[in-house]
Swiss-Prot record:
Family: Belongs to the CpcE/RpcE/PecE family.
Disulfide bonds: none
Keywords: Antenna complex, Lyase, Phycobilisome
Main function: Required for the chromophorylation of the CpcA gene product.
Molecular-function GO term, any one: oxidoreductase activity
Protein name: Phycocyanobilin lyase subunit alpha
Keyword Lyase recorded: yes
Amino acid sequence: MIEPSVEEFPAENGPQLTPELAIANLQSSDLSLRYYAAWWLGKYRVKESAAVDALIAALEDEADRTELGGYPLRRNAARALGKLGNRKAVPGLINCLECPDFYVREAAAQSLEMLKDKTAAPALIKLLDGGVAQAVQVTGRPHLVQPYEAVLEALGAIGATDAIPLIQPFLEHPVSRVQCAAARAMYQLTQEPVYGELLVKVLAGNDLNLRRVALGDLGAIGYLAAAEAIANAKAENSFKLIALKGLLEHQMSAESNALSISDQAIRVMNLMDSLL
């Protein structure tokens, strides 16, 4: 049995909720209602204090378990808390990094990336213990021993420069997606173009899914030198537009005090127009 790591409740298949009802449902004895409520609160960005508190409490749920020992409600609660943007959730998410459920740890790392709280760095770094040599696949499972992609991306996003010596070896990890995550983090932490160029190189590869990953990474780090390579990549325009939008947002943020739009920003806009 492979446990899913993604949310499984399309809105049209679930009950109609209001924020108040969703918060109440998190206390329900019906596990399916609780699971859906956690997903719904994240999906619709319900940022009320009561919602945040209820989701934080759900991170410690023991009732909703899979046959393999997973914690589905905890997973959805962890994912939702990242979307709500409240740093009150950080301590609970840090605790989730020690959960025996891989997918809870992954969701917690992804949300800590969104929240960008530096206090999470030591706990995230701990998940890199053993380095590349220990970063192997779990026997009989579809994942590695730790959610390395999410951990590396989180460390990059929160600016954990102390982790650079631990992240760099993952550029040589045998799993290409982990290599991409390491390159993404290294660029964020050093701003050295060599790491951005590693991601650009992936765009020329034969694996479409990996090209999509690299597009997302380049957009996330705002590597402006990749603009043309992104526009010309062999991938769906929707992925390329999202990546270019990321570049543009980074550039506009850097130019927030400028009186006019730079030529570089205009260049990205023109590339986006060419894909529409």
